[in-house]
């Protein structure tokens, strides 16, 4: 049983969903970034989703672009990122670690080299934000060869065919993209998410974790109620780093409070 399977089985027993925060490695600097990842896990994060800083993050909003800039300014390189992941992995042998990256970064030293480094550092999954399923073969084959789950996005507008492909090709978990989480009053996860989940289950997809615009406990609760296996929170986590970057103590306290309240909301 791999780390994701073990996690979902454990959460099912406890009747909980997964809370997965996203941060960019090296934001605001490599040393503090390690403390941040440690703090997130200690405060209740079930898994981590991590970005490797990149100068042109297409799919990211301004908050995560800011994280990339801070990390690059503090001289964070992919090599430093893999070192930090390996350090977290040795301290937390059971916590699933996923990467969210862009194809250019994977191509930089060759696809195989990238996945070999992931394997060595103890990464469990890789989501390449700008590679759709129909262009994923080369990445997927290398990932699987190195024991890494390829993660795919199921967008709200996906056709049944797309969902079936995502279900068939993905492993670890399915990243369910929800536009349902952007504004307060209208975020009732409602039909679209429930329908998508139903479809994904029909196709026997890996457990679906809802991401995009998840910033408060009520949304996590909604995601889990709608049948998602958990929720990913990126911008909201990164915003706390942005706000408190000058004061590490306040920063780690804010992340602890945020993570524990989001995790508490995963109880069914």
Swiss-Prot record:
Pfam families: Trp_syntA. The keyword Membrane does not apply. The gene is trpA. The active site is at residues 49, 60. GO terms for molecular function: tryptophan synthase activity. It comes from the Bacteria. It catalyses: (1S,2R)-1-C-(indol-3-yl)glycerol 3-phosphate + L-serine = D-glyceraldehyde 3-phosphate + L-tryptophan + H2O. This is Tryptophan synthase alpha chain. One of its GO terms (cellular component) is cytosol. The alpha subunit is responsible for the aldol cleavage of indoleglycerol phosphate to indole and glyceraldehyde 3-phosphate. PROSITE patterns: TRP_SYNTHASE_ALPHA. InterPro entries: Aldolase_TIM, RibuloseP-bd_barrel, Trp_synthase_alpha_AS, Trp_synthase_suA.
């Amino acid at each position: 049983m791999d780390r994701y399977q073990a996690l979902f089985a454990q959460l099912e027993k406890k009747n909980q969903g997964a809370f997965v925060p996203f941060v960019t490695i090296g934001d605001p600097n490599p040393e503090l970034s390690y403390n941040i990842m440690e703090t997130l896990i200690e405060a209740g994060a079930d898994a981590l989703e991590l970005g490797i800083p990149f100068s042109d993050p297409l799919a990211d909003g301004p908050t995560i672009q800011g994280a990339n800039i801070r990390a690059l300014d503090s001289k964070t390189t992919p090599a430093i990122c893999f070192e930090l992941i390996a350090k977290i992995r040795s301290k937390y042998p059971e916590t699933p670690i996923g990467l969210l990256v862009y194809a250019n970064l994977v191509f930089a030293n060759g696809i195989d080299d990238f996945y070999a480094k992931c394997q060595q550092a103890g990464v469990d999954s890789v989501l390449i934000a700008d590679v759709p399923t129909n262009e994923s073969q080369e990445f997927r084959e290398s990932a699987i060869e190195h024991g890494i789950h390829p993660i795919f996005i199921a967008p709200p507008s996906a056709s049944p065919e797309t969902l079936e492909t995502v279900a068939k090709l993905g492993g670890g978990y399915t990243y369910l993209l929800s536009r349902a989480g952007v504004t307060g009053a209208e975020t009732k996860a409602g039909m679209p998410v429930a329908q998508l989940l139903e479809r994904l289950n029909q196709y026997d997809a890996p457990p679906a974790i809802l991401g995009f615009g998840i910033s408060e406990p009520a949304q996590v609760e909604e995601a889990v109620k709608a049948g998602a296996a958990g929720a990913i929170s990126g911008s909201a986590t990164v915003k706390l780093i942005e706000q408190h970057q000058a004061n590490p103590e306040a920063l780690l306290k804010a992340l602890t409070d945020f993570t524990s309240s989001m995790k508490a909301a995963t109880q069914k």
